[in-house]
Amino acid sequence: MKKLLLTALCVLFLLVVMPLHGVAGGAVTLKMAMYQPANHAFVRYYTAMMPMVEKITGGKIKIKIYHSATLLRSTEMDVGINKGVADIGFSYPPMMSASIPFLGLTDLPGIWRDTKGFNDAFDNGLTELYEEAYYQAGLTNLKVIGLTNIGFWYPCANTKKEVRVPADMKGLKIKGMGRMHVKYVDACGGTGVNVPIAECYESIERGVIDGCTGFTSNFVSWKLMEPCKYFVDFAPGLGPMMLIVNKKSLERKVPKELREPLLEILTLLVKAHRGVMLADDAYNHDIVMPQHMKYYRPNAEERKAWIEAGRPLVEEWLSKTGALGKKAMEIVEKYNQR
């Protein structure tokens, strides 16, 4: 993956840098908002790539990263970038699903076959539908560049007992990493709760909550694997990170000659990151997390039970998203046939 990325960047260098040496004006600095902490694999990747962006554009564009929610929190990302608080940023779309139901699509349990189906769907129509959903909701300054993912999410790591099937969630108070996760915990028979992720470790350690859902990056970067003892090794779905840009910032700050090359570079980085993140996800899952938690891997029948528990959430989502949701689900099903 690293060789592929470097090769692609070299091609971009030949196609983009040489013409850009004739572009007049000084360097443009754009603000990129990320809510993940500095040690998160997501932040590390883009921090390493930004000097390449500057080099490829002949020093004409600099992108400064504001990580750890220093510029925008996760719940503020979409609206904040639309307002121009940041020029560029990574949104976790389901965070906005309460006000824009369509954005909850990626967190729906049981609809994704695998990472290929996920990526193929977004590369063949879903990305454009997300931009349409933003537009319909009044966030008209947002341009969607592309979508990467932060790996698989899991329904329960806890301190109390081994969980094998959804019914075993009964009696457990579980923090959900997002609105849909909370609803899925409820649908499985547990009690889904909202706790700020920065408070999650202490809440589990003190017994305020029994555990959490999460991505492998949550368990490792936030160390949530440490107070938890049991982990159900079934992934209902994948998590998205969407790169969005403020259109007005692009037009106002970036010279016309640089806009398309910049978008091409950012699109490439997003797609290349998919492989980088999944490698990190696999390392966390296979090597790091088992040192702290006892895994239970559901059998085929038990996996069906976990998928069935999420069916009502899929139906509810479809009922709230109308024609746009129907069109999106058709794309999902086309590229995720089992």
Model-flagged regions — what are they?
Residues 1-29, 338:
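Short, low-complexity disordered leader/linker segments with a strong preference
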Residues 15-16, 44, 127:
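Residues in and immediately flanking transmembrane alpha helices
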Residues 17-18, 129, 270-272:
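A short hydrophobic/aromatic micro-motif that marks alpha-helical segments and, especially, helix-coil
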Residues 23-118, 134-338:
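N-terminal secretory/targeting leader peptides
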Residues 120-133:
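Signature of the catalytic double-stranded beta-helix
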